[in-house]
Amino acid sequence: MFIKKKIDLGHGKVITIETGKMAKQADGSAVVTMNDTMVLATVVSSKTPPSPNQDFFPLQVEYREKYSAAGKFPGGFFKREGRPSEKEILSARLIDRALRPLFPDGYYQETQIIISVISSDTINDADVLGGIAASAAIMVSDIPFANPMSEVRVGRINGLFIVNPDINELAQSDMDICIGGTEDTICMLEGEMKEISEAEMLDAIKFGHDAIKKICALQRELAAEVAKPKRPFSPTVAPDELVNFVEEHCSAELKALAYTPLAKEERAEKTKAIYTQTIRKTLTHFTDRVGPDQIEADPTSAFCLNEHMIEECIHAVEKKVMRHMILDDGKRLDGRTLEQVRPISIELGLIPRAHGSALFTRGETQALVTLTLGTKKDAQSVDTLTDDKDKRFMLHYNFPPFSVGEIGRVGGAGRREIGHGNLAERAIKMVMPSEQEFPYTVRLVSDILESNGSSSMASVCGGTLAAMDGGIPLKKPVSGIAMGLIKEGDRYAVLSDILGNEDHLGDMDFKVAGTRDGITACQMDIKIDGLDYHILETALEQARKGRLHILDVMAEAIPESRADIGKYAPRLTTIQIPVDAIGMVIGKGGETIRSITEETGAEINIDDDGTVTIACSSPEATKAAVETIKTLVSKPEVGTIYMGKVRDIRDELGAFVEFLPKTDGLVHISEIARERIAKVSDVLKVGDRIKVKLIDVRKDPRTGKTKFALSIKALLDTDQQAETNGEAKPARD
């Protein structure tokens, strides 16, 4: 049955949701359209019961942009889509993070959601449409999922909010915020902003939530018309006798441990010991009490002998103890108050060959960030359905397994690393100088050496410090902090600078980065329903205080960017040449520019407007390259010395030398040496590179052509005079 629904969100943003036409063998499918951008989402959930020991929800979200959607060919030899791009991975994470908390607790069926962009108008990003399509596909399926989710993008132009702005509108906007939520609450937030205030952020969220409510209502209408019954689902629940026994035998020890401030590793060891001891006691207790007859009469009693179920019960007690400690006593696992930030230490310039470096340590989280400066050719080429550009600022985040004391795979960046790096990059991008002010390509690499929460925000702080250490004139320093939440009924506590355990056992992970004057990036994930705006307001204000405290500590280490770039960084010199002289500098097949590079060691880039950028770590080599290029594009002047190439030899006349591109002059036989020579070929041969001096310029009265007279002998006389006077001879290329 084909059903189609439509909603107008204003400003010409009309969204259509349809189902029943495409991918009908999937458990659920939906197509969402806005203008000429169309997204197909499908969902399939396994009907095979999960393993009794499974304790996680295996949800896989894949987002793919088909090049054919925009009438483009994929790049590369094979001309077909390959592994997911960074943009596709980030879009998949955006949708995954909003959907995952909305599945019912205990639903562990393997589930796969595939979102395919099947048409693109190249100006509307399909990521938020993919979130709507995925939710609609689940709503019309038989998969348990009570509340629809919608995603929108919010921008602001001249003080007016706009929903789902296209790329042209985003270019004028001072914010780009993706919001995911249900009719009742916000469950996901991510975006970048140009130093907006906390109040402005809250207004943007409220504006986006109004649109989300309308789209969610439309999904409910769609699902009601499909009227597909949901498959029966009963979450596995531990027997009361098991829950009570476990709590009785581990609650006191876990509480005593929670109230004792310990390092991460020591706490983990002591917690593991309590788990092991409690499991042993529980198995001993129930082995004699739960036999085959009882299991046959009550199959759930078998859970009393299941180690995995016992672990789940202990974990529930651990979570309860920590949450009550925070809510009742305002104390945290490491002894801090709710708003207190962990101790911070900063070391700059510790990597000698890097162009800038910083070691940022906050508590037991440590990031080593290094800076590399490059030229325009080092920029990353980005090719998506809505964008085709060179990216000149990038931040890469690495999270090796040793940072949490584990053994693991070492290879390419995973989805989490790409997501964390992107967040830190967006935070710092807003304060980067313009290309005209700082024409370098910039790469920051954050290697997490230790982790106990907030490693992405440590990357923001470390990245800012490394950039300042490397002499990048940032508009303002940026810091970041991760906020947490513990909420039970009407009681709640907002935590500043959360630990890993507080993230794992808490209800929110809200990362906020910005300058003293406003927010530049944020990311929020919520695990509960019912987050109200008052809690968000509290979290934003508390994050502002923490951010300012961190900026104060950073300012003590380095108050402002260094006056100069690192000594090993390439020096960029920019000169302007006439557009019609570009070919002259490049030469036939790149011969001229290649020879300049080989002789000076400088890297040279020429833009179509005649802007020449010369990169070299040696000032002398840079000067030589600049002089050579200026000489190439200048008009020939008598008395100037050039490096030329012998093109032709006439034994009784002289040698024709190309001393400028496509410009030849004659070195008469009498101007080759001080002594008389019989034949030019005795001294020179075609292809020789020689220094010559321009001694005369005149027009041929018969042809009107300009002729140039060159001399080698004049240079020999000059060299002899310089040696007599103890002067250095001039060198010009």
UniProtKB/Swiss-Prot annotation:
Residues 570-629 form the KH domain. Its main location: cytoplasm. The keyword Magnesium applies. SMART domains: KH (SM00322), S1 (SM00316). SUPFAM superfamilies: Eukaryotic type KH-domain (KH-domain type I) (SSF54791), Nucleic acid-binding proteins (SSF50249), Ribonuclease PH domain 2-like (SSF55666), Ribosomal protein S5 domain 2-like (SSF54211). This is Polyribonucleotide nucleotidyltransferase. It is an enzyme of class 2 (transferase). It comes from Chlorobaculum tepidum (strain ATCC 49652 / DSM 12025 / NBRC 103806 / TLS). Mg(2+) binds at residues 503, 509. GO terms for molecular function: 3'-5'-RNA exonuclease activity; magnesium ion binding; polyribonucleotide nucleotidyltransferase activity; RNA binding. One of its GO terms (cellular component) is cytosol. It catalyses: RNA(n+1) + phosphate = RNA(n) + a ribonucleoside 5'-diphosphate. Keywords: Cytoplasm, Magnesium, Metal-binding, Nucleotidyltransferase, RNA-binding, Transferase. Its EC number is 2.7.7.8. Residues 639-713 form the S1 motif domain. It is found in: Cytoplasm. The lineage of its organism: Bacteria, Pseudomonadati, Chlorobiota, Chlorobiia, Chlorobiales. Belongs to the polyribonucleotide nucleotidyltransferase family. InterPro entries: ExoRNase_PH_dom1, ExoRNase_PH_dom2, ExoRNase_PH_dom2_sf, KH_dom, KH_dom_type_1, KH_dom_type_1_sf, NA-bd_OB-fold, PNPase. Its cofactor is Mg(2+). HAMAP family: PNPase (MF_01595). One of its GO terms (biological process) is mRNA catabolic process. Involved in mRNA degradation. Catalyzes the phosphorolysis of single-stranded polyribonucleotides processively in the 3'- to 5'-direction.
